[in-house]
Structure formats: C-alpha cells, structure tokens
Amino acid sequence: MNFYKVFIFVALILAISLGQSEAGWLKKIGKKIERIGQHTRDATIQGLGIAQQAANVAATARG
C-alpha cells in the first residue's frame, strides 16, 4: 500500500515536470478546445435569442 502511494507521488511529480516543459503542444490543444467552447456558447446564446423572438411572434399571433 505504501509503495502504491509513493509510485503515484513520483508519477505525479514526473507528469508535472514533463508537462511544464512540453506545454507548447498542450497549450495549442487547450486553445482549440477553448475556441470550440466559445463558438458553442455564442451559438447557444444566438439560438436562445431566436427562440425567444419566435415565442414572442407566436404569442402575438395568438392574441
């Protein structure tokens, strides 16, 4: 059980140290994911606005 904790700790330290030196490609992937998220957010906001307008038109048409 102790070996398992030590192994996880060493693996975590290695991952952090290697991750900092190899951050270039990881940062690019993160930026792409962030951009996709922004586009999704903007499309959702736009879709909600259109749906609200359609609901207003439907309510006006009903009287």
UniProtKB/Swiss-Prot annotation:
Residues 1-23 form the signal peptide. Pfam families: Cecropin. This is Cecropin-1/3. One of its GO terms (cellular component) is extracellular space. It comes from Drosophila virilis. PROSITE patterns: CECROPIN. It is found in: Secreted. Disulfide bonds: none annotated. Cecropins have lytic and antibacterial activity against several Gram-positive and Gram-negative bacteria. Keywords: Amidation, Antibiotic, Antimicrobial, Immunity, Innate immunity, Secreted, Signal. Belongs to the cecropin family.
